[in-house]
Each structure stands twice: as structure tokens, then as C-alpha cells.
From Swiss-Prot:
Its cofactor is Ca(2+). Keywords: Calcium, Disulfide bond, Hydrolase, Lipid degradation, Lipid metabolism, Metal-binding, Secreted. The lineage of its organism: Eukaryota, Metazoa, Chordata, Craniata, Vertebrata. This is Acidic phospholipase A2 2. It comes from Naja naja (Indian cobra). GO terms for cellular component: extracellular region.
Amino acid sequence: NLYQFKNMIKCTVPSRSWWDFADYGCYCGRGGSGTPVDDLDRCCQVHDNCYNEAEKISGCWPYFKTYSYECSQGTLTCKGDNNACAASVCDCDRLAAICFAGAPYNDNNYNIDLKARCQ
């Protein structure tokens, strides 16, 4: 769920507030359209697409689905006791948090004009 995703981001990018990722580029945060502005925004586009795939599992609601995972020294592991939906959502969030850690953060892409830049 979103609370767990926030904590995964804190695990892989402890130097930044997770809020920094809640309104970034065209895809980080609510919705998503147009061309991603950079690598970090591409991480969010992939995450959005991953959630769309997870939603194809019967009764799977990625934003609310809780799952079992572990954070140890910046390394995320999804636990084996997750059902198909939980495993899928956990992996979406894990891969996005790892992607965030490897992508440069450009302050100019925070809280951008979506209408102007994300067509």
C-alpha cells in the first residue's frame, strides 16, 4: 500500500523526504501523461504501469494492498508469504524504490506545470 511504499522509499533514499517524490515530473504522484521528464520520472511511469498490471489480478487494489517485506541496510526484500496480488504490488514498489535510489533528482522537475510539460 502507499504507506509501505513510502517506507520503502525511506529505506533506499534515506537522504530525501518521500514527499519529494509525491509531485515530481509527469508520473510521480497522481495520474500520469505525456513524456517522462527524466530517469526518475521514468521510474514512476514504470511503477504506474506495474500497478496497472497488478490490477488485472482479481480483487487486487495496489494502493491499498498490504504486503510483507523487509528493509535491511538499504536492501529491500519481498517476503515469500505474500499472495499473488501482494507479491506483485510489493515487487512494483520494491523496484520503484530501487529505481529512485539510482536516478538523479532534479529540483526543477518538482511540482511542474503538468498542462504545459506533460502533454
